[in-house]
């Protein structure tokens, strides 16, 4: 009876024995993804520039290990992969989640430094992590999840964040490129496009009840999303349930992008 119960529990925990790396995993969507992967048996490495936020996340996520990292620095990205392999011996899952959101400005108001910083973090940073992770994922037939945005799918009236939208659109195309490039090696690459989710990044848009009601009404399902809902989508892509899924772009946005 105990043996059967143990096997049943292990079956429910879809990621037992897996090593996952979640960039930007100390808060928001990244934290929710790291937490749900851990709850399903994975050992999760999380990265953040902020060491204090990493400590707080480690305290809340079972079987997690935090590493400080500036995604704009190649040497720090390499250090994350080196530490992960040295400590755990392999890598099964990479979640490219780290990102920044610029101030809302029209194109003529954006200076080149702002533009470059957004692309360096949101796009080139994902390239850096994926490039360093691929040799390890080749050994495990692992998977990659890119966290894009529905802002990468279409333009929104009044949403003047061109660099952000450009970086997220490019990540969608890269998902398909990488899925084709590494399909023969059984590495699956998929993408999630969240809508407006209740995180620190979206708080500037949700300053009062009027803002919240407006944003809720922008989504056909009548509300903004919760980080855990993106986490559940990520869990699907990392599990064997998605063993025949690669190059997919999943919108988790309450219907916002179909308007």
Regions found by a protein language model. Give the residues of each.
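Substrate-binding pocket helix/loop in short-chain dehydrogenase/reductase
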Residues: 105-107, 111-119, 215
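Conserved glycine-rich cofactor-binding loop
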Residues: 19, 26-27
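Alpha-helical segment proximal to the catalytic Tyr-Lys
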Residues: 135, 176, 180-184, 243
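C-terminal helical subdomain
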Residues: 191, 213-241, 245, 254
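Residue(s) in the substrate-gating loop at a strand-loop-helix junction
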Residues: 149
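Active-site helix of classical SDR
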Residues: 130, 167, 175
């Amino acid at each position: 009876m105990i043996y059967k119960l143990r096997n049943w529990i292990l079956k429910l925990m879809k990621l037992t024995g897996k090593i996952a790396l979640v960039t930007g995993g100390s808060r928001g969507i990244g934290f929710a993804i790291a937490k749900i992967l851990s709850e399903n048996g994975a050992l999760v490495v999380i990265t953040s520039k902020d060491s204090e936020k990493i400590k707080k996340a480690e305290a809340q996520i079972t079987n997690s290990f935090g590493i400080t990292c500036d995604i704009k620095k190649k040497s720090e990205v390499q250090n994350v992969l080196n530490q992960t392999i040295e400590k755990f011996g392999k890598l099964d899952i990479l979640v490219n989640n780290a990102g920044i959101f610029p101030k809302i400005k029209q194109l003529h108001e954006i200076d080149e430094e702002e533009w470059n910083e957004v692309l360096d973090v949101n796009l080139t940073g994902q390239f850096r992590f994926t490039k360093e992770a691929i040799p390890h994922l080749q050994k495990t037939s692992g998977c990659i999840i890119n966290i894009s945005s529905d802002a990468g799918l279409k333009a929104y009236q009044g949403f003047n964040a061109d660099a952000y939208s450009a970086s997220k659109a490019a990540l969608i195309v890269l998902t398909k490129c990488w899925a084709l490039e590494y399909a023969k090696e059984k590495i699956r690459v998929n993408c999630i496009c969240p809508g407006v989710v209740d995180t620190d990044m979206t708080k500037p848009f949700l300053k009062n009840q009027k803002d919240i009601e407006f944003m809720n009404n922008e989504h056909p399902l009548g509300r903004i999303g919760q980080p855990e809902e993106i986490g559940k989508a990520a869990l699907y892509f990392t599990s064997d349930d998605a063993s025949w899924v690669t190059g997919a772009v999943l919108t988790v946005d309450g219907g916002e992008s179909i308007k």
